[in-house]
């Protein structure tokens, strides 16, 4: 199997890479929805997997199928830039939001997850995931908030309501946007 993957069959390589990336994104989404935490073993570990795969499968970033030295270095460099630029951008967005909101606006797990996404998708995929995740989160959460407001009104305890100021995990929306990009 490994020889087939390294041998240059693009369809098998893409399937292999897609399965690994989708698995990481699904696992992270489920854990983040249940616990509001993203474990480092998946975010940082996923970043390391993305960097490694970019070295051995430069096709991940659109380079030649043949495992030649220049393509391998270019794939690794593209992955590294994606990791750094994506996570840095989200860090600064979170820092600016914290300044205005006077409270934590974004978890560190989301920043590390975006590094993983950048390692697999490049910096363009990371930027797409930030804004795509924000749009998906908004589009999917507004109906939930409206239905809850209509159905529950003031009968539901304050700590169980969705609404402004209630923490909503961003990781699943980042993951959905990343999978759309990938």
Regions found by a protein language model. Give the residues of each.
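Functional transmembrane core segments of multi-pass inner-membrane proteins
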Residues: 14-141
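N-terminal transmembrane signal-anchor/hairpin module of polytopic inner-membrane proteins
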Residues: 1-12
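Short, flexible coil/linker elements and helix-boundary hinge sites characteristic
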Residues: 7-8, 64, 152-156
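Short basic/hydrophobic patches in alpha-helices and adjacent helix-turn junctions
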Residues: 116-120, 141-148, 178, 182
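Interfacial loop-to-transmembrane junctions
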Residues: 108-109, 146-180
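Compositionally biased, low-complexity repeat tracts
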Residues: 3, 71, 78, 159-161, ...
